[in-house]
A protein has these predicted regions:
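Extracellular glycan-recognition regions
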Residues: 1-211
């Protein structure tokens, strides 16, 4: 470190007393597992980056060819990361749908029994609110997909406005203001998925743009 006036070097220590953030990250992106852990093998069951997530799913592991392998034998197998500071954002991943009742993305999670879900189920795109054991549909629309299809899902939350895009096109949207902040991740109902990549990106709320 150089002095401001004479250019002399100053040696010493800098102590950071606290470090935090507010709001959702500008862009938090995870690539494929092999990009993040080049030493990964098909038998690797955990990594340092996997430990940044909390899982209530039966199985949550790094996948050798994508990023995550997630399975759960019953409804509501949830995996999340993030904090209560995450408010207006979009969460995105490329998901391969295997045999399951429903699967997709989670946002604004306050634990694994209170969150918004955006899933593909029974030829429909569905946005729902999970509150304890009760699941309430916010909006749904027809969406053609087959078992073993791979689709890019993006779940965007801007204030009370919720929308799910499939392969870059809005599939369903609705409004609810029960949850205004919380973490993001995945949900699997009675089945399994592969998830290739994971991105959380802050969005500028329309309310802020008007101010």
């Amino acid at each position: 470190m150089s002095g401001a006036a004479g250019g002399s070097r100053l040696d010493g220590s800098v102590i950071i007393k606290s470090l935090d953030w507010s709001g959702a990250p500008e862009c938090y992106r995870m690539g494929r597992s092999m990009e993040m852990t080049p030493t990964l093998t098909p038998w690797t069951t955990t990594t340092s980056w996997l430990k940044t997530f909390v899982s209530s799913a039966d199985h949550f592991c790094p996948d050798y060819t994508t990023t995550f392998s997630i399975s759960h034998a019953a409804p509501n197998g949830v995996v999340t990361t993030g904090t209560m500071d995450w408010d207006n954002y979009s969460v995105k991943s490329v998901i391969t749908f295997s045999q399951q009742d429903a699967a997709g993305l989670v946002a604004r999670a306050k634990g694994h029994r209170r969150y918004y879900g955006a899933v593909l189920k029974d030829k429909k795109a569905v946005i729902y609110k999970q509150c304890d054991a009760k699941r309430t549909v916010v909006a749904e629309a027809a969406c053609d997909f087959e078992i073993d299809d791979t689709r890019e899902l993006a779940f965007t939350l801007d204030g009370p406005r919720l929308s799910l895009a499939v392969d870059g096109k809005t599939a369903v949207s609705g409004q609810d203001e029960s949850y205004l902040c919380g973490g993001a991740g995945f949900v699997v109902d009675s089945g399994a998925i592969l998830a290739d990549g994971f991105e959380v990106k802050r969005i500028c709320s329309r309310r802020n743009k008007k101010d």
